[in-house]
């Protein structure tokens, strides 16, 4: 911390003591606020200076917030007070608030939290303002805010000290307000469709439901190893077995993997499951739900992301993974019949693979390396290979593939869904194949889950399921480049 900063803090501490000496509590009490900044602008900006003067008696308001600017000397001054909705100017005169309150005004610093009672008026320049009749210090700020003209220039500091980012960056505040509304509209849509919101455990005895490395913890009283959940899936499917036919959960998921602009070790997902549905039905739900959210939160289904305009309004494209690869590379995986032929095709097209990869893995590598980033407009890619889809139902017409889809927008995966595998015998065989992969070095392969197989043996109806990463969806709908911009407190390396 610089000497200048230390000096500013010392001055604020001195002012704090002066307030105590005057018998004033610098950390205040309840304040009855009647109005907020933006609604005041909406209600009163329409009136002229003269009209406001005539309406003075009916324009009495009480506001509270943080001092963001302050100017003026002598017997009067102006400031901008910021609350959650925005900013409004206040005008403080000694002959209006009295000598004692004006002394408090004079000693107030940027960042202090204040309460103001007064009436609405417009200045000579036409700016709507509150003419203070009472000025109250509610909280003394002991640290100065970042430079008001530059805000928080250090991106890392914005993430580490999100509270400062929210104070100084209204765009950031609006992003998190939109995030809250996105979740609200997601719930509204699903509840209207007859889904039941449930809560399931975050600590599991087996890390299942996804191909990911888990965080491991230990339960001392039970002397048991537990895993922070890497997916919500398997518990929700147990509920489908139990007769809860349309369920969803919005919750935190943990994966012990890399940190990037698109990945955080803990993130929020929605998973939903509907009995008697298949992956085509889930495509419809996904498309309609995201379109609904965009229209309700943004007022439009045409979304700007970076330099792209994303059309969520028109019917979304649907394409088989093998067809998508053929369109982009000319390689027809429908006609490739063996692992060796797939490896030859990979070598010819410069696709990076490993020796233990089979047909399905190689098709997926073709897709990820050549196709994925080209899918800018909303696209459902379906027909994933069985090797990479241990929980999805085999396709009835071609058992090399599954009834699964992923949603891609702006070259990123935004959802994963399938017609769920409800055959316990097939499910056991898939888990056993995953165990072989684990022995061959795939540390993200699925564990055997005997309890889940037992649940399937009681009978799970044909079911469609979906998982969506909330953080990526919020990134899309708020035009945010990094996942850290949509997480209030993203994970950061220790200093």
UniProtKB/Swiss-Prot annotation:
InterPro entries: Aa-tRNA-synt_II (IPR004364), aa-tRNA-synth_II (IPR006195), aa-tRNA-synth_II/BPL/LPL (IPR045864), Lys-tRNA-ligase_II (IPR002313), Lys-tRNA-ligase_II_bac/euk (IPR034762), Lys-tRNA-ligase_II_N (IPR044136), Lys-tRNA-synth_II_C (IPR018149), NA-bd_OB-fold (IPR012340)
Residues the record lists as binding Mg(2+) 1: 406, 413
Gene Ontology molecular function: ATP binding; catalytic activity, acting on a protein; lysine-tRNA ligase activity; magnesium ion binding; transferase activity; tRNA binding
Cofactor descriptive note: Binds 3 Mg(2+) ions per subunit.
Cofactor: Mg(2+)
SUPFAM superfamilies: Class II aaRS and biotin synthetases, Nucleic acid-binding proteins
Listed GO biological process terms: lysyl-tRNA aminoacylation
Membrane-crossing segments per the record: none
Keyword annotations from UniProtKB, A to Z: Aminoacyl-tRNA synthetase, ATP-binding, Cytoplasm, Ligase, Magnesium, Metal-binding, Nucleotide-binding, Protein biosynthesis
UniProt-listed Enzyme Commission number(s): 6.1.1.6
Compartments, record wording: Cytoplasm
Catalytic activity: tRNA(Lys) + L-lysine + ATP = L-lysyl-tRNA(Lys) + AMP + diphosphate
Ligand binding (Mg(2+) 2): 413
GO cellular component, one term: cytosol
Gene3D superfamilies according to UniProt: Bira Bifunctional Protein, Domain 2, Nucleic acid-binding proteins
Family to which this protein belongs: Belongs to the class-II aminoacyl-tRNA synthetase family.
Cross-referenced NCBIfam families: lysS_bact (TIGR00499), PRK00484.1 (NF001756)
Subunit structure: Homodimer.
UniProt protein name: Lysine--tRNA ligase
Organism of derivation: Staphylococcus saprophyticus subsp. saprophyticus (strain ATCC 15305 / DSM 20229 / NCIMB 8711 / NCTC 7292 / S-41)
């Amino acid at each position: 911390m610089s000497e200048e900063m230390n000096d500013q803090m010392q001055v604020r501490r001195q002012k704090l003591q002066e307030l105590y000496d005057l018998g004033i509590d610098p950390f205040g009490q309840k304040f009855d606020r009647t109005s907020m900044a933006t609604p005041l602008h909406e209600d009163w900006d329409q009136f002229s200076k003269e009209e406001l003067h005539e309406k003075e008696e009916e324009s009495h308001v009480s506001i509270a917030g943080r001092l963001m600017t302050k100017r003026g000397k002598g017997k009067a001054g102006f400031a901008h007070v910021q609350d959650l909705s925005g900013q409004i100017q206040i005008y403080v005169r000694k002959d209006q608030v009295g000598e004692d309150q004006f002394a408090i005004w004079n000693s107030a610093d940027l960042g202090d939290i204040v309460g103001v009672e007064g009436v609405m008026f417009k200045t000579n320049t036409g700016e709507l303002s509150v003419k203070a009749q009472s000025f109250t210090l509610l909280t003394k700020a002991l640290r100065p805010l970042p430079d008001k003209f530059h805000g928080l220039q250090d991106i890392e500091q914005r993430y580490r000290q999100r509270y400062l980012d929210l104070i100084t960056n209204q765009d950031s505040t609006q992003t998190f307000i939109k995030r809250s509304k996105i979740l609200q509209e997601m719930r509204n849509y699903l509840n209207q469709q007859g889904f039941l919101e449930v809560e399931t455990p975050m600590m599991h005895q087996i890390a299942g439901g996804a191909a990911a490395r888990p965080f491991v913890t230990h339960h001392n009283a039970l002397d048991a190893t537990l895993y922070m959940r890497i997916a919500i899936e398997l518990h929700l499917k147990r509920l489908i077995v139990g007769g809860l036919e349309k369920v969803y959960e919005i919750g935190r998921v943990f994966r012990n993997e890399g940190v990037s602009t698109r990945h955080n070790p803990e993130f929020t997902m929605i998973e939903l499951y509907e009995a008697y549905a298949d992956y085509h039905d889930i495509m419809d739900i996904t498309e309609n739900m995201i379109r609904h959210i965009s229209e309700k939160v943004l007022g439009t289904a045409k979304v700007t992301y970076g330099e792209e305009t994303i059309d969520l309004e028109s019917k979304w494209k649907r394409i088989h993974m093998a067809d998508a690869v053929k369109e982009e590379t000319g390689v027809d995986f429908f006609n490739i019949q063996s692992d060796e032929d797939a490896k030859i095709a990979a070598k010819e097209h410069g696709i990076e693979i490993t020796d233990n990869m089979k047909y399905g893995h190689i098709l997926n590598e073709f897709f990820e390396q050549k196709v994925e980033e080209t899918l800018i407009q909303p696209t459902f890619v379906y027909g994933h290979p069985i090797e990479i889809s241990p929980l999805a139902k085999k396709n009835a017409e071609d058992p090399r593939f599954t009834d699964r889809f992923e949603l891609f927008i702006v070259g990123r995966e935004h959802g994963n869904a399938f017609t769920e595998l409800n055959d316990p015998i097939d499910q056991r065989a898939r888990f056993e194949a995953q165990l072989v992969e684990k022995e061959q070095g795939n540390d993200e392969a699925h564990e055997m889950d005997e309890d889940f197989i037992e649940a399937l043996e009681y009978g799970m109806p044909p079911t469609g399921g979906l998982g969506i990463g909330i953080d990526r969806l919020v990134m899309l709908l708020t035009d945010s480049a990094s996942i850290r911009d949509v997480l209030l407190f993203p994970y950061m390396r220790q200093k």
